[in-house]
Amino acid sequence: MAKSVPAIFLDRDGTINVDHGYVHEIDAFEFIDGVIDAMRELKKMGYALVVVTNQSGIARGKFTEAQFETLTEWMDWSLADRDVDLDGIYYCPHHPQGSIEEFRQVCDCRKPHPGMLISARDFLHIDMAASYMVGDKLEDMQAAAAANVGTKVLVRTGKPVTAEAENAADWVLNSLADLPSAIKKQQK
């Protein structure tokens, strides 16, 4: 049995990059200040980095799965060029009211459902209790709770934070950039 590892689960839009709405082109992808350094530091601290992102724009016909994959590959390489290696990238292309029939469905992977986190747990042998979920929406916190992630972290870099999302979170930080120091402070 492989040894389990702690992970940082990361929402993408509004957590890693500025959420301009249905971001699917390299020109529109803008890393949030400080997140690359934070991700590098989290890797040094021994955490696996796993992106878990709802991409309903695919189901809604805003962009294709191929366009999403091209952007994801670019993001992955951009991070690798800065010494940040992602351990996994999971995405949900579905939406119950999608205009693209192939992706119009109720699924287990779309947050707030925990499917992407459970898949990552099983494939990467993740210690969920020692892990963190970082996102900007209530659905991120709900998915983390359903997957038994130890610490739910809401960030203020995406959509306006709701009281409901704050109540569902264990921590509320201004940005992913603040997470390494927050974890170190907690571990003292």
From Swiss-Prot:
Binding of Zn(2+), residues: 92, 94, 107, 109
Residues the UniProt record annotates as site (Stabilizes the phosphoryl group): 53, 111
Cofactor requirement: Mg(2+); Zn(2+)
Residues where Mg(2+) binds: 11, 13, 136-137
InterPro entries: HAD-like_sf (IPR036412), HAD-SF_hydro_IIIA (IPR006549), HAD_sf (IPR023214), Heptose_bisP_phosphatase (IPR004446), Histidinol-phos (IPR006543)
Any Pfam family hit: Hydrolase_like
Entry's Gene Ontology cellular component terms: cytoplasm
GO MF annotations, alphabetized: D-glycero-beta-D-manno-heptose 1,7-bisphosphate 7-phosphatase activity; magnesium ion binding; zinc ion binding
SUPFAM superfamilies for the chain: HAD-like
Major place of residence: cytoplasm
Subcellular location: Cytoplasm
Active site as annotated: 11, 13
Catalytic activity line of the entry: D-glycero-beta-D-manno-heptose 1,7-bisphosphate + H2O = D-glycero-beta-D-manno-heptose 1-phosphate + phosphate
Site note Contributes to substrate recognition, residues: 110
Coiled-coil stretches noted in the UniProt entry, renumbered to this chain: none
Pathway assigned in UniProt: Nucleotide-sugar biosynthesis; ADP-L-glycero-beta-D-manno-heptose biosynthesis; ADP-L-glycero-beta-D-manno-heptose from D-glycero-beta-D-manno-heptose 7-phosphate: step 2/4; Bacterial outer membrane biogenesis; LPS core biosynthesis
EC number, as in UniProt: 3.1.3.82
Keywords (A to Z) from UniProt: Carbohydrate metabolism, Cytoplasm, Hydrolase, Lipopolysaccharide biosynthesis, Magnesium, Metal-binding, Zinc
Record: residues binding substrate: 11-13, 19-22, 53-56, 110-111, 137
GO biological process: ADP-L-glycero-beta-D-manno-heptose biosynthetic process; lipopolysaccharide core region biosynthetic process
UniProt record similarity statement: Belongs to the GmhB family.
Quaternary structure and partners: Monomer.
Function, as annotated: Also catalyzes the dephosphorylation of D-glycero-alpha-D-manno-heptose 1,7-bisphosphate and 2-deoxy-D-manno-2-octoulosonate-8-phosphate in vitro.
Protein name as it appears in the record: D-glycero-beta-D-manno-heptose-1,7-bisphosphate 7-phosphatase
Species of provenance: Salmonella typhi
Lineage: Bacteria, Pseudomonadati, Pseudomonadota, Gammaproteobacteria, Enterobacterales
GN (gene name): gmhB
